[in-house]
Amino acid sequence: MTDILAAFGWVFDPANWAGAGGIPARLGEHAWYSLLTLVLAAVIAVPIGLAIGHTGTFRGLAVGVSGALRAIPTLGLVVYLALITLNLSIIPPLIALTILAIPPVLAGAYSGLESVDRRTIDAARAMGMTELQILFKVEIPLSLPLIIGGIRSAALQVIATWTVAAILPVGGLGRFLFDGLAVQRYDEMLGGSILVIALALVTDGVFAIVQRLVVPRGVTAGKIQDVRSKDPWRPIGPSVPNHPVGNSSM
């Protein structure tokens, strides 16, 4: 308990909020590194995932590659890339963390398109829509919550892993952990960890809100309709009797 109080004392110490190595600067660096990593991963993985989800081809290969990429030890890859390139900038961890972020983004993209009701796609084709129109006007809008969910999962992994990437001389919140360890300032180490957790929670909350906002209203209505009626094609509304109302004796 004393260590936690000391960590919060370090976080709220005004002296730690000034200068190039202060909390705002390190927080901005960490957020920028994470955003850059997510953008690179999305640019690579989302188009591939959309192509796989739309055509249904190479899904098994995508699953296998995603599993293999998840198994790569990220810290080991960061150090390895730094050694073979003799580069101590953000490039080695940026490459390694982009590789880490690709699998969840890829999975979210192709599983999102696979979740779209095939009857909806068949109806779009029957209306004369081209494959590109089906992709951009039907499949992507309906699968957007799952696509955002994949990016959301990748964001949390990236934010956490950029912390250990500070084993190289780069910025970010991980600097507080490694610099604190070097001088045995455990309040600084724990305070840096608290900041990483706070950044991850805020990021997750933002993505959760976005994920809810991109859900099409028709999808929600469709779920209510399925609950109220076993027949998915029966419209919701007042029931109409199957026989005429009146004097049956006439």
Residues covered by each model-derived region:
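Cytoplasmic-entry segments and transmembrane alpha-helices of multi-pass inner-membrane transporters
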Residues: I48-L81, L97, A107-S115, D122
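Periplasmic/extracellular loop-to-transmembrane helix junction in inner-membrane transport proteins
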Residues: M1-L38
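Glycine-rich helix-loop "coupling/hinge" segments at transmembrane-helix boundaries
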Residues: S66, L83, T161-L190, I194-V196, ...
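Short cytoplasmic-facing helical segments at TM-TM junctions of multi-pass membrane proteins
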Residues: G108-I147, L173, L177
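Alpha-helical membrane-interface segments at transmembrane helix boundaries
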Residues: P24-W32, S66-L69, A82, L86, ...
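C-terminal transmembrane helix and the adjacent membrane-cytosol boundary/short C-terminal tail
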Residues: G56, S111-E114, R118, L190-M250
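Loop-to-helix entry region at the N-terminal start of transmembrane alpha-helices
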Residues: A25-Y33, A82-P104, S143-L144, E188, ...
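Transmembrane alpha-helices
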Residues: L35, L132-A165, D187, G191, ...
